[in-house]
Amino acid sequence: MQEQYRPEEIESKVQLHWDEKRTFEVTEDESKEKYYCLSMLPYPSGRLHMGHVRNYTIGDVIARYQRMLGKNVLQPIGWDAFGLPAEGAAVKNNTAPAPWTYDNIAYMKNQLKMLGFGYDWSRELATCTPEYYRWEQKFFTELYKKGLVYKKTSAVNWCPNDQTVLANEQVIDGCCWRCDTKVERKEIPQWFIKITAYADELLNDLDKLDHWPDTVKTMQRNWIGRSEGVEITFNVKDYDNTLTVYTTRPDTFMGCTYLAVAAGHPLAQKAAENNPELAAFIDECRNTKVAEAEMATMEKKGVDTGFKAVHPLTGEEIPVWAANFVLMEYGTGAVMAVPGHDQRDYEFASKYGLNIKPVILAADGSEPDLSQQALTEKGVLFNSGEFNGLDHEAAFNAIADKLTEMGVGERKVNYRLRDWGVSRQRYWGAPIPMVTLEDGTVMPTPDDQLPVILPEDVVMDGITSPIKADPEWAKTTVNGMPALRETDTFDTFMESSWYYARYTCPEYKEGMLDSKAANYWLPVDIYIGGIEHAIMHLLYFRFFHKLMRDAGMVNSDEPAKQLLCQGMVLADAFYYVGENGERNWVSPVDAIVERDEKGRIVKAKDAAGHELVYTGMSKMSKSKNNGIDPQVMVERYGADTVRLFMMFASPADMTLEWQESGVEGANRFLKRVWKLVYEHTAKGDVAALNVDALTEDQKALRRDVHKTIAKVTDDIGRRQTFNTAIAAIMELMNKLAKAPTDGEQDRALMQEALLAVVRMLNPFTPHICFTLWQELKGEGDIDNAPWPVADEKAMVEDSTLVVVQVNGKVRAKITVPVDATEEQVRERAGQEHLVAKYLDGVTVRKVIYVPGKLLNLVVG
């Protein structure tokens, strides 16, 4: 064994061994308990970033630990390879998206191997290959036949920069989630999957997910947005149709003083025929931003349509307005307005001088003051005829029942969730497998024409999709009739909604899934990824699992038992102000900093002498140029050091602050482990450990070893507090470094301790542990070694610490055998100088003894 720890020499050697031995390849084995550990698959952007490294290190630690427990562990990896960035990069680099993507995959695959992740590479998949997306296309045609897929023209969120449609979930604060451009409204024909048909199940089954973070479950609950209310029908004078509205507050119905409809509503369109002001307003609304955050804060505007609706209970005529806060695609495109008890309705009514009628009393029983704002709290009704005096619940039911009796109301459950629009007007995605025949009939692509292959050898102009620009591509024949293929492609969330299941049978050619393999491995035991996916990917992922279950492919209700959302990785961010006042962000690697005595940055400059402004720690990002390249760190310190720092610096679900001093600390620790093993093995062979022959000091050290095993096992397994597990191993290492190594049993005990330390560190730092295990002559490869088990007998304390008090004040702490009697403890306490001093010449009136903990002598 060489004296110095040289990761650059050992890591590549160990990685080659894993490759040649195919160490992490697994197959179904009914005789073993399975464990499926999955990290969210990466987009092949070109290079790994520290967020990836953190995500995949957490996964690898868990997978290696579970493997050492003797389980059959599946840890696969693949590539979420379709998507818009490839199109932009292709235009920029004068290439096509396919070669750019495949080059990136090859490069990033090497980076993953360099970090020592124990993946089953035989299951690697890329979602952009026809071998993968053919099954997604086939499944889509099956869903169409079941009535779960439909096409309709709808107002969509349109990103003018990316030239594509965004799902509601992809609009963040009125902007595109990807490029931050302001989103516009556009009418476009789109394909939808009926996720709303599964709304109740998606909501109710959240209760089964005991090991998912509450934050994620709450976000999904709110997104699904189930509400109970009443659908009410209004007659409209001089209009052929009725208007239907939905309300969750029928108790306020007697205070309804106007109705509001969307600009796109047929009633508004009809009224606009003779109303130029309304026609102009409708045009303006076409470009209104639709994100809910914007809807809440934008100025509320409207125009009176001139139509009057008749209140079904009072018979009063109330005006119908067109308003920019009502959307056609939400509910019925019409809402009832109760300005006395809804703030939005109040603001609108105040602005346009509409009637405000209070019908709910204030909490103290007085009439509410509506001079400044609406009273939105629930309460007792007044001003409501026969319903006066009823509380919220009684009024809800009484008014709902009355409307139902009259045939103008119906109790309804509503959802905020909308069907999933899966059409994208981009090229680099899986073609949607639908065709339109000459006679206008729309039908699924026949099975014998699947997969509909996306041509990869294309020229990108950055504006039009190559398959839309090439009229020949769309031409096909179905049942002898000419037909045109759909030129939209799937939202890339389609591919990432079922990849986890395809990993169980990546080579299967008879269908989407081999049920036998899928049901052996599924559900996923732990799924690791960022919380930013809470309502997009993680909702679609659950939905797809239920679709596959109902197609008979899987037999579980949910795709993953546990979800672990890792925290972000932060780094220092610096900039200097340029000549034109712009911020030039400087990488923390290039910042020369001065710190105060507490280690805080007080001054910084770059190599060119620019005075830098330090903005604190923020998420590693391209925009702030504060990303740290994992490859550079691995080349400098080794993969094991980077992995150890990642797991030690912070709990897995909290933000991690990148500090190179911390990385250096992790590296020093591994050097200490190496040195201790080197010094130990240099002394030659070791005798067998004779537990019965150990001295008290040796027993105490062995107790520490086994207590550490117990703690680390609990920290990694049950608590998943990996940082505290590492801290416990470090603490033990400090004790081992000071332990005597001269006697035969000293060395035998050291051998037992080091074999345990190396196995406990193995999930975190597998390369160094693989090597040290061999040097310590551990049995076989460490990859097949069992996790160390704490010896309960070794952990039993021989002695215990008893606090001795005189009149309630601590006078001594004594060590006594655990089985010492009260008499023996009193005798031992009396030998302490301070205790003897306070007992001299006084009478002990009372003795309070808590066995093994406390002796209190009351004197007087």
UniProtKB/Swiss-Prot annotation:
Keywords: Aminoacyl-tRNA synthetase, ATP-binding, Cytoplasm, Ligase, Nucleotide-binding, Protein biosynthesis
Span of the annotated motif 'KMSKS' region: 619-623
Family, per entry: Belongs to the class-I aminoacyl-tRNA synthetase family.
PANTHER family in the record: LEUCINE--TRNA LIGASE, MITOCHONDRIAL, LEUCYL-TRNA SYNTHETASE
An example Gene Ontology CC term for this record: cytosol
NCBIfam families xref list: leuS_bact
Residue span of motif 'HIGH' region: 42-52
UniProt-listed CDD domains: Anticodon_Ia_Leu_BEm, LeuRS_core
Catalytic activity: tRNA(Leu) + L-leucine + ATP = L-leucyl-tRNA(Leu) + AMP + diphosphate
InterPro entries for this protein: aa-tRNA-synth_I_CS, aa-tRNA-synth_Ia, Leu-tRNA-ligase, Leu_tRNA-synth_edit, M/V/L/I-tRNA-synth_anticd-bd, Methionyl/Leucyl_tRNA_Synth, Rossmann-like_a/b/a_fold, tRNAsynth_Ia_anticodon-bd
Amino-acid positions noted as binding ATP in the UniProt annotation, renumbered to this chain: K622
Places the protein is found: Cytoplasm
UniProt protein name: Leucine--tRNA ligase
Database matches in Pfam families: Anticodon_1 (PF08264), tRNA-synt_1 (PF00133), tRNA-synt_1_2 (PF13603), tRNA-synt_1g (PF09334)
E.C. number(s) listed in UniProt: 6.1.1.4
Listed GO biological process terms: leucyl-tRNA aminoacylation
Single GO molecular function: ATP binding
Keyword Magnesium: no
